[in-house]
Amino acid sequence: MAENKQVDTEINGEDFTKDVTADGPGSENGDAGAAGSTNGSSDNQSAASGQRDDDRKLFVGGLSWETTEKELRDHFGKYGEIESINVKTDPQTGRSRGFAFIVFTNTEAIDKVSAADEHIINSKKVDPKKAKARHGKIFVGGLTTEISDEEIKTYFGQFGNIVEVEMPFDKQKSQRKGFCFITFDSEQVVTDLLKTPKQKIAGKEVDVKRATPKPENQMMGGMRGGPRGGMRGGRGGYGGRGGYNNQWDGQGSYGGYGGGYGGYGAGGYGDYYAGGYYNGYDYGYDGYGYGGGFEGNGYGGGGGGNMGGGRGGPRGGGGPKGGGGFNGGKQRGGGGRQQRHQPY
């Protein structure tokens, strides 16, 4: 019996939580949104709506570049009714990246796929795994000292399972700052919460916003000679062991939630960049990154190709001379020194 594994719905800087949906707007392979969006039954759509997409989503890695949506549907359709399929392609070349996402109409199909000994498509063994839901994070502003930590947790706990609560502390004033971050186990919880941007806790009105990562142009600043280096380097540039590890900006501040969040002092929270993500999303899928120059199956390995600047400098930067990672480390100054704060 095959091992029932789960993998994050994020790969090498991209979020795939929302691009496989019943109405199919996120498709990158042209006809996946139309052909794979429904299976012709409104009753099945209604039944599936009672279950989160994440619970019914399958990641399929190790695909041949020639594998089509139809071939995936023919193979996995025998395990259960398929709601949608999205074969991921490179946006520049249109070439398959060697993996896809499939959403079934029920969770039982995922169990059946996992229970099978092996899966062969186009004479090639593929690697299907249950996709794990992406966490969602909110920013809560306008908190007064009268609102206790426990009241905050209790209030937001009614909307979904809380994974983490971050409450920055003002050392000078010896009190909690007027904002916090709350992470839920599902992005859907955040989507639902944002329908009511103004909430009341203990009779006090607070602002609720989606916590967003630092803009890419700021994130990439470390590649142009940032003080502590943007890229961790190691051995792989992008993918592999090196990875793009910007959880800490090297200055001891949190990375990615700069910008202030409208007067709540969140700018003091620095550059908080949650979870070591690149563009907000982490490296999941046990090596199914496509940073290896789209060679082989388009996943696995480290560095090389379009997004992996060589083998990585020994103490930082992604390129051969610690140069920033892209295109063999030709950018100026990237990363040279190891970050002072290591990500956890």
From Swiss-Prot:
PROSITE patterns for the chain: RRM
Extent of Gly residues compositional bias: 222-238, 301-337
Note on domains (UniProt): Possesses 2 putative nuclear-localization domains, a M9 motif found only in isoform B (sqdS) and a M9-like motif found in all isoforms described. These may mediate interaction with Tnpo/Transportin and Transportin-dependent nuclear localization.
Region (Disordered): 1-55, 214-238, 301-344
Assembly and interaction partners: Interacts with bru1/Bruno; the interaction is direct but weak, and may play a role in regulation of grk mRNA localization and translation.
Source superkingdom: Eukaryota
Loss of function: phenotype: Semilethal in second to third instar. Females are sterile and lay small eggs with a dorsalized phenotype.
GO biological process, one term: nuclear-transcribed mRNA catabolic process, nonsense-mediated decay
Region feature M9-like motif, mapped onto this chain: 215-254
Keywords: Cytoplasm, Nucleus, Phosphoprotein, Repeat, Ribonucleoprotein, RNA-binding
Record-given protein name: RNA-binding protein squid
Alphabetical list of InterPro entries matching this protein: Nucleotide-bd_a/b_plait_sf, RBD_domain_sf, RRM_dom
Compartment list: Nucleus; Cytoplasm
Its job: Component of ribonucleosomes. Could be needed to organize a concentration gradient of a dorsalizing morphogen (Dm) originating in the germinal vesicle. At least one of the isoforms is essential in somatic tissues. Interacts with grk mRNA (via 3' UTR) and involved in its localization to the dorsal anterior region of the oocyte during dorsal-ventral axis determination; may function as a ribonuclear protein complex together with otu and Hrb27C. Required for polytene chromosome dispersal in nurse cells during oogenesis; nuclear isoforms play a greater role in this than cytoplasmic isoforms.
SMART domains the UniProt entry points to: RRM
Residue ranges occupied by any RRM domain in the UniProt entry: 56-138, 136-213
Residue segments, region M9 motif: 300-338
Main subcellular location of this protein, as a coarse class: nucleus
Polar residues composition-biased segments: 36-49
Species assigned in the record: Drosophila melanogaster (Fruit fly)
Cellular component GO terms held in the UniProt record: catalytic step 2 spliceosome; chromatin; cytoplasm; nucleoplasm; nucleus; omega speckle; polytene chromosome puff; precatalytic spliceosome
Residue numbers bearing the Phosphoserine modification: S148
